[in-house]
Amino acid sequence: MNRRFWRDRRVFVTGHSGFKGTWLTQWLTLLGSRVTGYSLPDSDVRNLASLRAAMSAAEPEVIIHLAAQSLVRASYQDPVTTFTTNVIGTVHALEAVRATPSVRAAIMVTSDKCYANTGHPRPFAEDDRLGGRDPYSSSKACAELAIAAYRESFLPKSPRVISVRAGNVIGGGDWSKDRLVPDLVRAFRAGQPAQIRYPETTRPWQFVLDALHGYVLAAERAFEREVPGAFNFGPDVRDARTVRWLADAMAARWGGGASWRASEAEHPHEAASLALVSTRARQLLGWTPLLDAETAVDWTADWYKSSRDLTVEQIEAFMELLPA
C-alpha cells in the first residue's frame, strides 16, 4: 500500500455511511485523502441526476462504489429495491463516472455471492460463471454484467473500471438486521441466546480492513496501469469456517455466559458453502489477508464491547502490519 498515493487524493465514496463505507472513509481520512461521501437518506444512487451532480462537484480522481442493498434475507422481502439499488444504482454510478473527466480509477464493489453457486466445494475464481439463486446474489451478478458492459463499451481505457468481490466481512460497526455478527451482539447485550440459522454453512470470514486493503490496492494499481477487470479478495482457505464456529468464537470472546442456539423457524435458501480464490490479487496487487479468522473475531468482539473508540486504534494496528 502506497500511503503517499492517498495524501490529498480526491476520493468519492458511495455508501460512505454504511459498515464498510465508514471504515473506508475513516481510513482514507487518516491517510490524508479528501473524501466526498454520498449515502442515504439524503443521497440515493437511484437518483442519477443527484449522483452525477455530486460527483461532478467533487471532481474525484478515484471513486469507490459501495452503496448497495447488502442483505440476502432483505432481498427476498423487497426484491425490487434490491435490484434497483444494486443494478440500476451501479449503472448510475458508471454513468456519473462517464460524465466526470477527473476520474482515473473506479472501484465497483460487488460480492462473493455474484457467482453461480451450485453447491460444489471448490472456491470461486474471477472467471467462474456468474449467477444467483436469491435476489441479492442475482442482483450482484447483474451488476457485474453491467460493469463489464460499461468497461468494454464506454470506458475501455480511462478511467479504469474494476469490480472487486470480497468474502463475508466482519468487524465493528455493522448494525444490520439479519446479519450474523450484529445479531449475535444484540443478543449477547440483551443477555439472551442468539438465534442462528444454518449453523453448518461455511463462509469465507475476513476482517473488514483486509477487504478494504484489497480495494485500495486495486485503486492504486488501476490508477497507474491496466489491470484485469475483476479481483477476488478472500481469506486463506483455512479461514473458511462454519457459522457454528464463528458463533462459538464470538460467544467465547464476549464472555459473561453469551450463548446461541439454532433457530427452528423456516428460512429462505442460503448456499451451504462459499469460498474464493484470490490468486490474482496476490500475484498482481501484492495483496494478502493479514488477519486470520481467530484474530478477526477477537478484534470484532472487542470493538463491540469497547465501541467506537477502537476504530482508529484498529486501523493503526492494521497499518503497522503492512509492508513499509
Regions found by a protein language model. Name each.
Residues 77-95, 99, 104-105, 114-169, ...:
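Catalytic helix-loop patch of NAD(P)-dependent Rossmann-fold dehydrogenases
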Residues 33-40:
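Conserved glycine-rich Rossmann-like NAD(P)H-binding loop of the short-chain dehydrogenase/reductase
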Residues 14, 60-66, 108, 232:
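Rossmann-fold scaffold of SDR-type NAD(P)-dependent oxidoreductases
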Residues 31, 188-324:
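C-terminal substrate-binding subdomain of Rossmann-fold SDR/epimerase-dehydratase oxidoreductases
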Residues 45-85:
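NAD(P)H-binding glycine-rich loop region in Rossmannoid oxidoreductase-like domains
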Residues 1-9:
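A short, basic/flexible loop-to-alpha-helix module at the beginning of a structural domain
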Residues 11-27:
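N-terminal Rossmann NAD(P)H-binding glycine-rich loop of SDR-like oxidoreductase domains
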